Amino acid sequence: MTTTIRLALGAAAMVLATIPYLAFAQAPPAPAQPQAPPQPMGFFISSVGVGDGANLGGLAGADKHCQALAVAAGAGTRTWRAYLSAAAAAGQPPVNARDRIGSGPWYNAKGVVMAWNVAELHGDLERDRNNVRKPTALNEKGQEVNGVGNQPNQHDILTGSDSHGRAMLGAANTTTCGNWTSNAEGRAMLGHHDRLGGANASWNAVHLSSGCSQANLVATGGAGLLYCFAVN
C-alpha cells in the first residue's frame, strides 16, 4: 500500500513538473516587431563617368549624368546633383560643391548614413565625422567602387573642391578643367573615396589630375567618376 502511494505521488510530481514546460511549448509566438522602412538612397558614386574625361558638359551636364544613373537605379523621383565646385568665370561668382547638395541626411544604396548634414560631411566642427569610405561609398547599384588594391584602381573622384567643399582659388582650368568643359588642357582636383594614397587621404581633395582627358584621369587612378547627392 505504501509503495503504491509513493508511486502515485511520484507520477503526480512528474506531471506537475511538466506543466510549465508544456505551457511554454504551447504558448503562441510573440508578434513580430514592425521593421522600420529602409531609408531612401541619397548618395552614390557614379558607376561610370560621362566618358569624355573632365568634359562633363559643365555643372548642368554632370547633374544630368547623376540624375540619369539615379533613374536607372529606381531613385529618379529625387533631384540629384553632382558634387562639383566651379571657379569664378565670365563675370559669374564661384560655385561651391557644398552649396549644391541639399542639407542631408544622405544614405547610401543599402541604407547606411553617410553624413547627417553639410557640416558633418565636411568636418566643420570635427574632422572625419562622415562615412565616406570604401565599404560604404557605394555606387548607385549598391556595389563597392574599386580603390587601392583593385584592378583597375578608380578611387580618384572629380570634385574641383577644397576639403571644405568650396571652389579653389585660381582660373577655371587649374582645378576644374575649365569648369567641367575641357577634355584637353587643364587640371581638376580629385578626392579619394577609399581614403588611401597621398599624404592627405581626403574624400574630396587629395591631388590634381595630370590633365583633363579620359586617359589623363585613368593614368592617376580614376575613371571620371562623380559623387552624386540628392538635394531633397
Model-derived regions: residue spans:
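Bacterial N-terminal signal peptides that target proteins for export
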Residues: 1-12
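Intrinsically disordered/low-complexity terminal segments and short unstructured peptides
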Residues: 1-3, 17, 135, 158
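Bacterial N-terminal signal peptides
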Residues: 10-21
